[in-house]
């Protein structure tokens, strides 16, 4: 049985984490190939892991006031796992190949958490039979933290839409976990949620725009030739193509506004000292200059021509995507 999980038996919790991360990377690559994922792939998983770790490292001195070094080390491992794992499973609703793909909100995240925890529980069981130290295993609480953190990344449409001061368009998306006033199991969920939508604030305008185009391509894989080679699809009328591209362009711009407008609410669950660190040291690009750059670079006005929109989506920044 143990040969299924390792070639060499883990001799520490760190080695257990390495086994889990190896499993996650293998599964993400498989899911990417099976489902033609241009955004929710290993690049995104590694980016979220990196951003989550950056958040953790920045606030670690503040956390160390109430946590031991051993606790922080295990917490960092959980953050790395959750950042890597959070989009491992992608579940699309059935649709024809020439229509946009849709997901049921929360289903992919739930399936991801279930799949990961099944593996961890099997790994725990396999190591238990080897009479390994209990500290090598993922505790029940740590498993709860992992589930909580993956569920924290669920995005839904804001039912208030543009009626609230913090939103700008009728199909606004946000992560309700960050707005839930109930006490969290740990900070891991909030860290992963912030990292997941943190491309603009942490990585800057170019990374944010590239992510937006990749999201569009993943939801509309039949437009691959448009994004790669600037070829307008013959199956769509020009006005339909323009409307689809313009809608996504506006979404990219409006979401940038929202990332900035929602930020203070989304970090409200952190201690004041940590909030100041997040503002000044981590989300350094979440400012009006970045918003203005996005508005300038992304054609989002009704007057934008079809050729201008195609030129934007068929950008050199996207030439390196894996097909």
Enumerate the language-model features and the residues they cover.
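Amphipathic alpha-helical scaffolding segments
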Residues: 99-111, 208-219
């Amino acid at each position: 049985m143990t040969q299924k999980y390792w070639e060499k038996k883990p001799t520490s919790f760190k080695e257990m984490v390495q086994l889990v991360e190896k499993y996650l990377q293998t599964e993400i690559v498989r899911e990417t190939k099976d489902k033609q994922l241009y955004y929710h792939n290993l690049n995104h998983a590694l980016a979220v892991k990196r951003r989550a770790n950056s958040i953790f490292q920045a606030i670690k001195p503040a956390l160390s006031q109430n946590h031991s070094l051993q606790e922080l080390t295990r917490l960092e491992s959980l953050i790395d796992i959750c950042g890597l794992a959070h989009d491992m499973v992608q579940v699309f609703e059935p649709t024809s190949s020439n229509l946009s793909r849709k997901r049921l909100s929360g289903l992919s995240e739930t399936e991801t958490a279930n799949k990961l925890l099944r593996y961890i529980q099997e790994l725990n069981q396999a190591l238990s039979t080897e009479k390994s130290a209990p500290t090598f295993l993922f505790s029940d609480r740590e498993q709860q933290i992992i589930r909580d953190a993956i569920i924290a990344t669920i995005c839904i449409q804001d039912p208030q839409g543009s009626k609230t001061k913090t939103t700008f368009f009728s199909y606004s998306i946000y992560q309700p976990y960050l707005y839930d006033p109930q006490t969290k199991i740990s900070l891991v969920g909030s860290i992963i949620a912030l990292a997941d939508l943190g491309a603009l604030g942490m990585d800057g305008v170019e990374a944010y725009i590239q992510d937006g185009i990749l999201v569009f391509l993943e939801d509309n894989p039949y437009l691959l030739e448009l994004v790669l080679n600037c070829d307008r699809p013959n199956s769509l009328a020009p006005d339909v193509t323009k409307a689809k591209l313009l809608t996504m362009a506006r979404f990219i711009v409006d979401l940038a506004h929202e990332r900035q407008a929602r930020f203070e609410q989304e970090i409200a669950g952190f201690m004041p000292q940590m909030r100041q660190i997040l503002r000044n040291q981590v989300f350094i690009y979440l400012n009006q200059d970045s918003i203005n750059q996005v508005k300038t670079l992304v054609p989002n006005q009704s007057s934008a021509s079809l050729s201008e929109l195609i030129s934007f989506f068929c950008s050199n920044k996207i030439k390196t995507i894996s097909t």
